[in-house]
From Swiss-Prot:
Record family assignment: Belongs to the anaerobic G-3-P dehydrogenase subunit B family.
UniProt protein name: Anaerobic glycerol-3-phosphate dehydrogenase subunit B
Molecular function as annotated in GO: glycerol-3-phosphate dehydrogenase (quinone) activity
GO biological process annotation, one example: glycerol catabolic process
SUBUNIT field: Composed of a catalytic GlpA/B dimer and of membrane bound GlpC.
Cofactor field: FMN
Amino acid sequence: MKFDTVIMGGGLAGLLCGLQLQQHGLRCAIVTRGQSALHFSSGSLDLLSALPDGQPVTDITAGLDALCRQAPEHPYSRLGAQKVLTLAQQAQTLLNASGAQLYGDVQQAHQRVTPLGTLRSTWLSSPEVPVWPLSAQRICVVGVSGLLDFQAHLAAASLRQRDLNVETAEIDLPELDVLRDNPTEFRAVNIARLLDNEEKWPLLYDALSPIATNCDMIIMPACFGLANDTLWRWLNERLPCALTLLPTLPPSVLGIRLHNQLQRQFVRQGGIWMPGDEVKKVTCRHGIVSEIWTRNHADIPLRPRFAVLASGSFFSSGLVAEREGIREPILGLDVQQTATRAEWYQQHFFDPQPWQQFGVVTDDAFRPSLAGNTVENLYAIGSVLAGFDPIAEGCGGGVCAVSALQAAHHIAERAGEQQ
């Protein structure tokens, strides 16, 4: 099977890369093993929240300039501030075109409220998520009886520290009892599958309506809206106060929705989606990827003109830690890492951990190297890249988006030259 590009990994980076390549008229396939890290995320995307020295970032342009000085090997630093902002804006346009109407500005970070009621700087958020400063003084944090994925009293306690009048309440929906037989089934995603049925919408409205008359804003867990935000908008039009949603413990309704919107758009535009499959071997001849062998296709290789590695980091098995060191399991690409295991981590758990910055070594075009030699038609994007700390620096989503589009543009340019 011949393709212009085969992408190994169907997470945020892989999907955005595929969508951008389709804009250039290239035929793409995505091989994906299972759920991506988006399923376990908040559904919000960070661009740059903090510098390596710990200084918080609000002005993104100034932050990117400072990052170039502090971390010259960071994926952003390799591109330059203006290029990062341009690619981030293009990514936001792609996301909106896919139906993910995310709120945010590439020039200025905003503060979203977290499930614990604290604030976190971010780039893009779903319109349901409350953003600081809140537009209300009287707030009620509402939990769902029996739902362990969200603790209303913890969020309320944090918000009270910001001089807000915050109460808590709990709604009980007997219609959800069918899920209570097994505690592991009473999760936000399973509740959403039930409540998203239009016949159930009035039940949720009836439960929230008495609470809404005594406050200016309701904050509740994101336990509906798995496909779209239609129910949220329907409730906001009818309730006498604003309704906002907070992501819950994973799996996350907002994260799954974002992934599904991107995946559906990729397929709608003619992309080949290969779920439940796994790349077992890549044939590389004279520094060029010629064949990709997958578990489900056995002796039928995929033959791409270009290949993209978007396999993620440790969480997605894109990187594997062993006693001898860190390795990239598909091709055995060169990996940036510390010399000894003792240097992998810091003693204090909440300190920035060195292992977070481990990843494949690439050139400035994000082409990785194998035994010191660049693989000419292979690009590495997203969390598998080295040189950045997605947690401490708050840049995970941004690096995925920016590197994906940079690789896509580079591939499209080279593909045009070869025709």
